[in-house]
């Protein structure tokens, strides 16, 4: 199945250097071009978890961030929010350092899906994308010497030298797991099912224009896979709005 992959940084601000703490977690989005002509999208990031359990909580976090600029009185709205929400504080303060490459990080689809087979049996699962090259982070000296756009430069050279490979797996839910709470990571001891291998073997012809034209929708799913977390629906409703604003349509 042909795929298109987009890597990204967290902040959504193009001027944030790749070495900045605001750039993590990193993102990996995959579009599968299915045989019937439709697309299916998978969106993941490099932290196994999410800062909030619901979209309402996420809204409150974003409001707190917006009201906590450099001139805000202490404690800021964000300080107060994080004091009351330890999971969000952990998310914002325990990110990994800059990676050697986008190809040397694992990525996690933190929202759950319901998978149903032809016999009607269903299981809940979350996606994980595991780098065949293993996880590799920069050391302090490498961070100090890295350029602001080193990741996009590195991945281009890496793909030109040899295909980049990831394992795609599904981590199965077990009894007691929070199916609709992406802020709670499931234990690493849970069984995983190998779904296949993602192979990136060439860049697109016009990378800058092509990546700006991509809109990934996590509810674009094939038959047999359904959203099991209401946040997925909210994300698919919000992403087209941000997409249109980036392109000046709104």
Residue spans for each PLM region:
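Active-site-adjacent core segments of small-molecule enzymes
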Residues: 1-250
